[in-house]
From Swiss-Prot:
Enzyme class: lyase
Keywords, comma-separated and alphabetical: Amino-acid biosynthesis, Cytoplasm, Diaminopimelate biosynthesis, Lyase, Lysine biosynthesis, Schiff base
Name this protein carries in UniProt: 4-hydroxy-tetrahydrodipicolinate synthase
PROSITE patterns named among the record's database cross-references: DHDPS_1, DHDPS_2
Source organism superkingdom: Bacteria
Cell location: Cytoplasm
Entry's Gene Ontology molecular function annotations: 4-hydroxy-tetrahydrodipicolinate synthase activity
Residues annotated to bind pyruvate: T46, V204
Entry keyword Lipid metabolism: no
EC assignment: 4.3.3.7
Keyword Lyase: yes
Source species of the chain: Oceanobacillus iheyensis (strain DSM 14371 / CIP 107618 / JCM 11309 / KCTC 3954 / HTE831)
InterPro entries given in the database record: Aldolase_TIM, DapA, DapA-like, Schiff_base-form_aldolases_AS, Schiff_base-form_aldolases_CS
Example of a GO cellular component annotation carried by this entry: cytosol
Amino acid sequence: MNFGKVLTAMVTPFDKHEEIDFQALDHLIDHLINNGSDGLVVAGTTGESPTLTHEERIKLFEYVVKKVNGAVPVIAGTGSNYTKASIELTKEVAKTGVDGVMLVAPYYNKPSQDSMYEHFKVIAESTELPVMLYNVPGRTGVDMDVSTVVRLSQIDNIVSIKDASGNLEKMTNIIRLTDDNFSVYSGEDSLTLPALAIGADGIVSVSSHIIGNDMQEMIQRFEQGQVAEAANIHQRVLPVMQEMFANPSPVPVKTALNLQSVPVGKVRLPLIELTDEQLQNLQSVLSDFEHSKMI
């Protein structure tokens, strides 16, 4: 199932009291839809899901669905390392009108491949919503094998994967061994163009908050056979992509949005704001990028 080319893993705006800032969220959604986002992934890693309560997640999903009003797909992060909790949240989320759910591989428990298969299988069987798997071993401590993904892809409503392993060989084999209607998205911004070259469907991106239109142009150039032009854009946007992960995400991207007059507030603990030196580095990268667009 194809949700679009550039899906933005959306940040969650907070006010000065660290409550969800729905006015800022309204502005952010407009900004993203108007600047290259084909879809929104809500309450994922970038949305600070570990520090959101159950009630906050539901309110977030309800608001985004109502605001978007069908303009782009909305995918809700309902994954957990507790299978029963993920099932319960997924069932409740289905009532909000989201277009799909994203399920992260169980973290901390370090399950086996067979355990992960059973975990995803029972959650998928509990809902009619399309399911996107999320493999992010750098955060979860477990890496989904190709064979596990292929087995799961045979379940009717498991339709996609966001793979943030950074392993293009693995991604290639997933693409090769799954049906054409099973979509594969890179979860690594810097691998957007290489992933397209091996047959991926697109990117679930953090950097698209800042450079969504540039990423769309890069993808369009590639699809039109203008590979050199796409590579030039890739080289130009790469420093921005790298800077978005130079410090724990979503600290850099939230800071960048605030700098660009898209207010999203600060992060919740245990994350903290950038140091003065880190902020200067971010500002320098953004300034250099803007200058490069004028050359």
